[in-house]
Amino acid sequence: MARHVFLTGPPGVGKTTLIQKATEVLKSSGMPVDGFYTEEVRQGGRRIGFDVVTLSGIRGPLSRIGSEPLPGKRECRVGQYVVDLTSFEQLALPVLRNAGASGRPGQSICVIDEVGKMELFSQPFIQAVRQVLSIPGTVVLGTIPVPKGKPLALVEEIRTRKDVKVFSVTKENRNHLLPEIVTHMQSSRK
């Protein structure tokens, strides 16, 4: 049976909301859960970027709408957003590196929301995700984008792993998926 669960679907369909709800249910049933999710940042009703938020409540910028790049400075951009790699790595990497640190098999769940274009500018993040997926005692609950344009190597690698179950989230099924996701996560730990 697939051990890890990844949600996929178009932007704004409710992947992060489902992750947050599943996390609450799993935590309240006594499972150790750690990780991070991404959240829109809005100003005056307009999206200006994304924050990365750890499950322990630490928040930092992932990206913001950018102005012109500074001369000579290499900038990581996705569309109009400039990615703050330093901030992202300071928050996400320690969480991923601590995954499975309890050392007891089947004892931890690691939330990775998301493995997407912005996050994949970070080579250490790519390595850390691969490592977490291979730790025997760790189950990953994550999100990946819908394939469009040029394939993202790590996303395709995750999508095709034998130990990963991918749920496609749609407006039609998003309100019914939670019990299935939670049940799968709980049975993956046994």
UniProtKB/Swiss-Prot annotation:
Pfam entry (one): NTPase_1
Gene3D superfamilies: P-loop containing nucleotide triphosphate hydrolases
EC id: 3.6.1.15
Modified residue annotations for N6-acetyllysine: 165
PTM annotation (N-acetylalanine): residues: 2
Segments crossing the lipid bilayer: none
Catalytic reaction list: a ribonucleoside 5'-triphosphate + H2O = a ribonucleoside 5'-diphosphate + phosphate + H(+); 5-methyl-UTP + H2O = 5-methyl-UDP + phosphate + H(+); CTP + H2O = CDP + phosphate + H(+); ATP + H2O = ADP + phosphate + H(+)
Highest taxon of source: Eukaryota
Enzyme class: hydrolase
Keywords for this protein: Acetylation, ATP-binding, Hydrolase, Nucleotide-binding
Gene Ontology molecular function: ATP binding; ATP hydrolysis activity; CTPase activity; GTPase activity; ribonucleoside triphosphate phosphatase activity
Function description: Has nucleotide phosphatase activity towards ATP, GTP, CTP, TTP and UTP. Hydrolyzes nucleoside diphosphates with lower efficiency.
Entry's family note: Belongs to the THEP1 NTPase family.
Quaternary structure annotation from Swiss-Prot or TrEMBL: Monomer.
HAMAP family: NTPase_1 (MF_00796)
Protein name: Cancer-related nucleoside-triphosphatase homolog
Organism: Bos taurus
Organism placement in taxonomy: Eukaryota, Metazoa, Chordata, Craniata, Vertebrata
Gene that this polypeptide is encoded by: NTPCR
